[in-house]
Amino acid sequence: MQKLTLPAPAKLNLWLHIIGRRADGYHELETVFQFLDHGDELSFALRDDGVIRLHTEIEAVPHDSNLIVRAARMLQAQSGTTLGADIWLTKVLPMGGGIGGGSSDAATTLLALAHLWQLDWDEDRLAALGLSLGADVPVFVRGHAAFAQGVGEQLTPVDPIEPWYVVLVPQVSVSTVEIFSHPQLTRDSLPLKMRPVPEGNSRNDCQPVVEQNYPQVRNALNSLGKFTEARLTGTGSCVFGAFPSKAEADKVLALLSATQTGFVAKGSNISMLHRKLQSLVKKSSA
């Protein structure tokens, strides 16, 4: 195989509790990740000269600092391959939105290049490499909805319901560093240590601080909250609410479209990236 095109799906944090702060400054979390059937798309073409080249410029992100390029070069170095790749990105997911755009792109890059370069790397090894790029990368590498602990890297598969979501995208980028260093951030939630999604006693501990500091996010939560429970994902800026059908979700988004930007997407416990990879494996073995 010389070329490969794969999706990089969005994720939601259905809830996010901060249960402590480690000596190294990182926060101990409990959260549930679920994927959306909505995301970026990446195309890869094999090179035999070892060059890694991303042909899509991302504003304010230098080429060599892009997580896609960093993931590709790290996999190249760790595997010892002499092959390279040309990479093109169709960017759909917002930066600083809390829906995993950069982490998902990095995970898709690792899985795609392991396939193109015919590396004998299993999911565990790719996820461990992904963790060095970001705490959210492993869940995208593994591709199954998960209850996460630690800094978000200790994953236990779960299967929450898969509703339709309205996701609103406030036109502001939230700084994760700013939120996690904020003095008013809750850092002492009681550990649930529960694998199922808790009913009625879950929340996003980052949400009060983000609402306080980002009025655009507060407005989005208030707008969506008129129709269903609205919640922040990650540190934002995106907010989401669940609906039982696409028709209901589409109707609500249409009603909000005069003042809010967003999209409708289906929740999925198996990422569309992994569904695509599974179909490729079936085709190649047929």
From Swiss-Prot:
Catalytic residue list: 11, 136
GO biological process terms held by the UniProt record: isopentenyl diphosphate biosynthetic process, methylerythritol 4-phosphate pathway; terpenoid biosynthetic process
EC number: 2.7.1.148
Pathway named in the protein's UniProt entry: Isoprenoid biosynthesis; isopentenyl diphosphate biosynthesis via DXP pathway; isopentenyl diphosphate from 1-deoxy-D-xylulose 5-phosphate: step 3/6
Molecular functions per Gene Ontology: 4-(cytidine 5'-diphospho)-2-C-methyl-D-erythritol kinase activity; ATP binding
Catalysis performed (reactions): 4-CDP-2-C-methyl-D-erythritol + ATP = 4-CDP-2-C-methyl-D-erythritol 2-phosphate + ADP + H(+)
Record SUPFAM superfamilies: GHMP Kinase, C-terminal domain (SSF55060), Ribosomal protein S5 domain 2-like (SSF54211)
Pfam families linked to this entry: GHMP_kinases_C, GHMP_kinases_N
Its job: Catalyzes the phosphorylation of the position 2 hydroxy group of 4-diphosphocytidyl-2C-methyl-D-erythritol.
Family: Belongs to the GHMP kinase family. IspE subfamily.
Protein's name in the database: 4-diphosphocytidyl-2-C-methyl-D-erythritol kinase
Name of the gene: ispE
